[in-house]
């Protein structure tokens, strides 16, 4: 998603959640700041849909749930509410205390990179996600060319980085028992369309 900074007023998490319930658009909450999330491009949406649909199909009747863009995640150690493009959670779902609309236990997250958010997604957002104990896999998908960055956490809490740019390559996921062909992630994506 594309982020836009809003005025520098600081909000409590409770104020944010109250505003978010009545809002027509989604917002991220980052340690007191509320940041509107604008709509994505057709390529952005297609990539998120392709990955989530593939994962949802491959994980049927297994103890995982796949969520796309509208599912809120709370990162308590960083005081961040965010909406990952694709998020996989092992069941049972764990919710933020006192809420039934905000999850806290993803095992895998994927973000589709845009020009305005790619640095944030690679750096600050990834650092925030790494504070979640259940989180062990991160996928960054480029919407302008076939290129995927893949991070997997090892048993000794080190992260292994791999990158792929060939449609015939299979992405072997560590957090969930499945493999995804890069060509399936990029199906119907038109690189000739600019943001």
Predicted regions and their residues:
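Gly/Pro/Ser/Thr-rich low-complexity, intrinsically disordered segments predominantly at protein N-termini
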Residues: 1-195
């Amino acid at each position: 998603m594309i982020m836009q900074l809003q005025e520098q007023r600081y909000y409590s998490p409770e104020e944010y959640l109250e505003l978010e319930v009545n809002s027509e658009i989604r917002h991220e909450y980052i340690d007191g700041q509320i940041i509107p999330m604008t709509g994505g491009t057709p390529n952005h949406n297609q990539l998120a849909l392709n990955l989530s649909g593939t994962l949802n199909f491959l994980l049927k009747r297994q103890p995982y749930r796949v969520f796309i863009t509208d599912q809120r995640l709370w990162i308590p150690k960083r005081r961040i509410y965010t909406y990952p493009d694709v998020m996989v959670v092992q069941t049972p779902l764990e919710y933020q205390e006192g809420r039934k609309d905000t999850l806290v236990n993803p095992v895998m997250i994927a973000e589709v990179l845009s020009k305005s958010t790619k640095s944030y997604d690679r750096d600050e957002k990834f650092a925030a996600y790494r504070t979640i104990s259940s989180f062990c896999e991160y996928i960054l998908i480029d919407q302008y060319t076939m290129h995927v960055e893949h991070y997997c956490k090892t048993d000794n809490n080190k992260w292994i980085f791999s990158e792929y740019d060939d449609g015939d390559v299979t992405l072997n996921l560590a957090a969930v028992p499945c493999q995804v062909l890069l060509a399936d992630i990029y199906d119907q994506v038109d690189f000739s369309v600019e943001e």
